[in-house]
């Protein structure tokens, strides 16, 4: 497994996605290594010889300028990685950008397979109108283990329950 830190010019990327104005990808690569992942096409834009799921570039970016540009906009975390994959516990890049965006008036749309997002529940609650989505491809835990390296389905459902009970819109990709 190859994990390294890389410097980037900015973390907020304008997007034409119908669900958001900005895409936020704090990492390149994803160690969930889902066999069905649409984002694996990103490998061709890297210099990594490793297969998708076996490398992770951890982004470092400068402070956000012009915070006013985000008012009444929406940011999607993340279009080609999981913002709460296991190494987020160590590097905390998703938490860093959430802290930088606090008070800007931006809405969040977050997609994950992880319950690590519970760490940031109070922070996410501070962004009105935000929503969080979890991917659940099966209820068969043995099959899930063959398909991805994410946390168990039970842990995903429990995280979803806690966000729902906290008043945050929750959705599920099945």
Where would I find each of the regions flagged by the language model?
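Conserved strand-turn element in the central/C-terminal portion of the radical SAM core barrel
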Residues: 148-149, 161-174
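Conserved Radical SAM active-site core
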Residues: 1-133, 137-143, 153, 157-158, ...
